[in-house]
Amino acid sequence: MEGVESKEREVMVAKPVAVGVSDLLLRLLAFTVTLVAAIVIAVDKQTKVVPIQLSDSLPPLDVPLTAKWHQMSAIVYFLVTNAIACTYAVLSLLLALVNRGKSKGLWTLIAVLDAFMVALLFSGNGAAAAVGVLGYKGNSHVNWNKVCNVFGKFCDQMAASIGVSLIGSLAFLLLVIIPGVRLHRRN
């Protein structure tokens, strides 16, 4: 057939998903920072002697008070979310190293669990941050006094733990976003 041009079409075949260095580094980062956040909050404790005025006619009574992480359920939740995310990060890192992108089903499960970790960590961070704001500012409407002026070290350590945990949240968020961007670029 003369005059008919033959154009070859390149057929793109899906390759198995290779585990990228960025994926491994983000999982390692998520593991490290969620572990650090959990440890920092788990050792957060401060004792102070606080003067309590019982009556105007009596001198203040000095009472030792201790602030501990397990006294507030939001902080307990924060610790548990970081422990779960830390455990998941190390397990997914090991699976990524062993599997090396061979099983599509496993990577689908990991992608779903990565998104779950984002939600879990951000909810834990939000709960802890809400308690932290109450600690720093109090709430005059319900007569909750601020406590961070008394337990400064405790509050600073809690704030540092929340900040470190946010890095873990962002690492998991990137683990969700990057594959989506790569998939979009292929199409």
From Swiss-Prot:
Main localization is membrane
Signal peptide residues on this chain, from the entry's feature table: none
Q: How does it sit in the membrane?
A: Multi-pass membrane protein
Q: Please indicate the ranges of residues that lie on the Cytoplasmic side.
A: 1-22, 99-114, 179-187
**Any GO CC annotation of this UniProt entry:** plasma membrane
Q: Where in the cell is it found?
A: Cell membrane
* Membrane-crossing segments per the record: 23-43, 78-98, 115-135, 158-178
Q: Which residues lie on this side of the membrane: Extracellular?
A: 44-77, 136-157
Q: Which residue spans adopt a coiled-coil conformation according to this UniProt entry?
A: none
Supply the InterPro entries for this chain: CASP/CASPL, CASP_dom, CASPL
- Could you list this entry's UniProt keywords, alphabetically sorted: Cell membrane, Membrane, Transmembrane, Transmembrane helix
The entry's family comment says: Belongs to the Casparian strip membrane proteins (CASP) family.
Known partners and oligomeric status: Homodimer and heterodimers.
What PANTHER family would the database entry show?
Answer: CASP-LIKE PROTEIN 1U1
Question: How is this protein named in the record?
Answer: CASP-like protein 1E2
Organism listed in the record: Glycine max
